[in-house]
């Protein structure tokens, strides 16, 4: 365990450098929005790299993009549910002290959170941090896969729709 701690500063620095490299690579992709870095942050630390897509501009929803990225060998996740739909924040389901003590402040089912819903249900794409441990090759491969998927977005969307129709019966 101690050896891992000793390696951490160099690994964190590499992830930070590769995240900046990924930001640059994705800034060229239509319909992709990278997270803006707050200038007050001195270090960028993460276990997942998160970016957003505009489904209309990119050509598909985030779940289809993540499925296609998985097929390309890029570990991907659509992220968490929006807060008002997330079980952890439902006082009737939570064992946490604060939601149980103040359930009136945690009545998320009756809240309208359109930005959170849009981000979580349509836009967010989370990449595994292992991509960044592979150096520029890992980032280049992931960025190339994202660009390839976008070039084929119409065909992939049509295939996905055919599958939805087939299995909704």
Where are these regions (language model features)?
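PLP-dependent aminotransferase class I/II
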Residues: 1-169
């Amino acid at each position: 365990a101690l050896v891992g701690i000793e390696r951490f500063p160099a690994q964190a620095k590499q992830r930070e450098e590769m995240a900046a490299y990924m930001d640059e690579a994705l800034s060229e992709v239509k319909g992709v929005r990278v997270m803006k870095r707050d200038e007050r942050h001195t270090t960028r630390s993460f276990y997942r790299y998160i970016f957003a897509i505009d489904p209309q501009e990119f050509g598909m929803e985030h779940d289809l993009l993540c499925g296609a990225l998985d097929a390309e060998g890029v570990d991907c996740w659509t992220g968490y549910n929006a807060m008002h739909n997330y079980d952890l924040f439902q006082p009737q389901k939570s064992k946490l002290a604060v939601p149980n003590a103040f359930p009136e402040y945690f009545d998320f089912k009756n809240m309208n959170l359109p930005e959170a819903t849009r981000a979580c249900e349509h836009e967010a794409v989370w990449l595994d941090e292992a991509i960044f441990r592979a150096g520029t090759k890992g980032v280049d491969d992931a960025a190339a896969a994202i660009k390839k998927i976008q070039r084929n977005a119409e065909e992939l969307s049509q295939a996905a729709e055919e599958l939805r129709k087939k299995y909704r019966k």
